[in-house]
Amino acid sequence: LTPINTRTFYWVSQVGMLAGTAVYVNAGTQLARLESLSGILSPGLLGSFALLGIFPLLAKKLVGLIQARKVYAGWPKPARFERNLVVIGAGAGGLVTAYIAAAVKAKVTLIEGHKMGGDCLNYGCVPSKALIRSARFMKTVREAETLGIANASADADFGRIMARVQNVVRQVEPHDSVERYSKLGVEVIQGHARITSPWTVEIDSEAGKQTLSTRAIVIASGAAPVIPKIPGIGSVKHVTSDTIWSLTEKPERLLVLGGGPIGCELAQAFAGIGCQVTLLARSGIMGKEDADAVALVEAGLAADGVRLLKGLDTVRCEIVEGEQRLIVAQEGTEQRVEKALPFDVLLCATGRKARVSGFGLEELGIPLTKAGTIEVNEYLQTRYPNIYACGDVAGPFQFTHTAAHQAWYAAVNALFAGFKSFKADYRVIPWVTFTSPEVARVGLSENEAKALGIAHEVTRYNLDDLDRAIAESAAHGFVKVLTPPGKDSILGATIVGEHAGELLAEFTLAMKHGLGLNKILGTIHPYPTWSEAAKYAA
């Protein structure tokens, strides 16, 4: 069973079991000496049973110390530390980590090589939702006739819309600014960080290079968009979800690669402000969601003018007579018939990859997962127990709220590991795709429950029966709840429709605190509101 020599295996096993054997034999000896009921309370017996309980914990701690000593071998430990914690990256994960450390008066340094706030503030959540707001207003204007309003019209000024997007980012910036975190007690350094040992971080900033010694390090370097390796892509105008916000002129023809949440949201938003949008999703859109949810989103995309193409392989990019084109071919066919898709701008939304290069991880031998994220344990520790990772760089989720969630565990464990450590809890993770209609989910989907072999019942409430939805001419979508057979505890909930993201919070709260559908049913919901959908589903 093992490559160890039989004799070696035998004596190592015997020696390894000596301590445990001694503890158990001692407990048995004490039990054998019992002569009366009063003997149960004897110090010897109580001590023996206490040792039985404590021994596994002590053994686990000892093994951990031995493993740590082996990992740290060859790295000189500083005699003193200048910081309690150094945080690399000022996105959601890094900001929350630094905030928590400052709140307990720890000496913490936050290092950011680019913009405070990370991708969410500057390129992701905030700008995309600002753009979606403009697109949804244009949709309201187009549907004004259904509300009894005649001759409504509006022109989408692309330049002004993009300027508003940047203005929204500027309004949110103070929440994540250097000034705010400095006032909280965080030392913020704008520069590039490199881990040079388990306890030292080298910082290259405008002021020059410096090295800080620290008891613990948290890596929160985030992720970056992946640009697909398509022949000729470098010769055409292509952008990512990070760089698209620099556009100042409207792309008349926008070709979007990728059918994930980012691709779907941006495709629909740009279509909403007047772009001709083609969405190329090889395996279909939103692969993690159930078919009934996907069908409604596909209908919403089509209604807003998005042309959805599935089952196509990308072959190459080319420019013919000044026209940029993506050449595609039908997936899986022997005789590949090529087809040209002309575009003005190509948006690559084919996923994001953890930022792991340039931080010294290779030199320290910190391993990565198959997904390219930093390998961490349940406490978010890397190979080195005092080096942690959280957010997109650690996975498995790429959401701002999960980065902040992980940051609490990373910060607390980094600061108090000697006293108490906490395992990161991923049991109740909500997420929302901000298409029209929105798709919001927490817990299991039907597909996941079936794949895992989990017995379940499905309760479905269609929003075309909800009075408020009918009043707003938005009576489309559903609330779907999975429960164990014959029980009301919630395994998962999926909501598709207007305000789905807001409605999901009630189910998230219920799952987090073990509240079943009967508790939701027994709660008064004001009439007429969207929140009643949760009660009717219950």
How should these model regions be labeled?
Residues 88, 102-114, 126, 130-137, ...:
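Flexible, glycine-rich terminal cap/loop adjacent to redox cofactors
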Residues 125, 221-276, 280, 304, ...:
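Glycine-rich dinucleotide-binding loop and its adjacent helix/turn
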Residues 1-31, 63-66:
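Hydrophobic alpha-helical membrane segments of integral membrane proteins
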Residues 81-83, 207-216, 334-345, 383:
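Core beta-strand elements of the Rossmann-like FAD/NAD(P) dinucleotide-binding domain
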